[in-house]
Amino acid sequence: MYKVKGKPWVYSGAIDVSDCATAKEVMLKAGLNFNVAKCELVGKMPIKLTGTDEELDRIIKEQKEGAHVFGTDIYRKCDNAFATYRTDYNIPLGVVKSKYTIVQNNDAFNFFDDAIGKNSAIWQTAGFWGNGEKIFVSAKLPNNILVKGDPVENYLVFTNTHDGSGGVKILFTPIRVICQNTLNAAIRTSSNYVSFRHTTSIHNKISVAQEILGISKIKSEEFGQYCNLLANIKVTDEDVIQFIGENLLTSDEIQRLKDTGHTIKDIAYRSGLALTDSKISSRKMNVISDTYSYYFDGPGQRDILGTAWGAVNAISGYYSNIDNIEGTKRFDSICYGDKSRKIENAFALAEAL
C-alpha cells in the first residue's frame, strides 16, 4: 500500500495559511512580516596588549581611521563586503556582494496580486527557514483542469533567499488531486518556472514574470490539453518499462545493458546478473523497479494504466510519494532540483511513446 505524502510545500514547519483572506494576514500568520536590509561587513581580529605608550598611540590612531577596539579585539570595515540582516531583530542572514538587490517579502505577495488578481489567490502554505534566510509562499489558482475526468489543481509557488545563496524562483505546477503527484512540465517551449538573480533589475523582472511564465487561464488550458493528449496515447507494459529506463538511466548505462546482452526489463525485474554485467548501481535498479511497480499499484494508477498519462504519473508518483527525502529538501528537490528535472523529462519523453 502506497502512502500519499501530499504537496511538497506542505511539511512540518510550514504554516497553513488557507484560512487567510488577504496577503497581510498571510504575512502576519507565517511570520513573514519582516524587512531585510544590507549592511557593511566588519572583520574581527585579535590584538595583543602590552601596555606600552607606542601601542596606545597606535590604537588611538587606528580608531581615528575607523577601527574599533573592544576588549582584546579590533574591528575593521571590510571593503566591498556586505551582509543582509533582519531589521526587526538585527539578525544577520548571509554575506552578499555590493550589487546585491534585496527583494522584500512583501514583493512576493505583490507578485501574486499581479499574476492572479488582488485578493484572488487561494493561499496554501507559507513560511521561512532558519532565521529567514529563505522564504516561500504557495497559492492555489482558481482554475482547475480535468484529464479524462481526473481533476488536476494548479498552484503557484514563490521562493526567495535573503542570504545570497540563490535568487527569486517562481513556479507554476499542477498537482493531480487523487495522488498529490507534482506534475512539473515544460509545456512545449514554455518553462514552468523562472528564476532571477538579486541584481538591480530584479524588481522589473518580477513584475513581468507572469508574462514570461504565461501564468493565466491560457497556461492552465494548455497544460490540460497536453495531459489529455497523453491520456489518449496507448502504451504497452514493455513501452512503460522502456520509458522508465530511458528517464532514469544514462545513455552509457543503456548502452552497457545492450552490450552485455541485457535489457531494461531485466533491471526492472531485479536481475542480479544484469546488474553485475552492466555495472548499474543497485540504487538505480531499485528506483526503476519501484517506479514500475508504482505504475500498476500507485494511488490513482488503475484508471490510467495503458496510457502515456499513466506512465508519466508513475515517474511523478515515485518522486512525490515513495522517494524518502522529507521536509525542505523534498520541497527543493521536487519543485526545483533533480526530482523536478526527472518529472519534467518524463513529460518530454512521453510524447514519443
Which residues does each predicted region cover?
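Intrinsically disordered, low-complexity regions enriched in serine/threonine
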Residues: 1-63, 127, 143-353
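N-terminal intrinsically disordered, low-complexity, charge-rich
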Residues: 58, 68-73, 80
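A short, surface-exposed helix-loop junction/capping segment
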Residues: 74-99
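Short, solvent-exposed coil/turn segments at beta-strand boundaries
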Residues: 88, 117, 163-164
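Amphipathic alpha-helical segments
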Residues: 98-122
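Residues at beta-strand starts and edge strands
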Residues: 108, 133-135, 152
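Beta-rich nucleic-acid/ligand-interaction surfaces
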Residues: 124-144
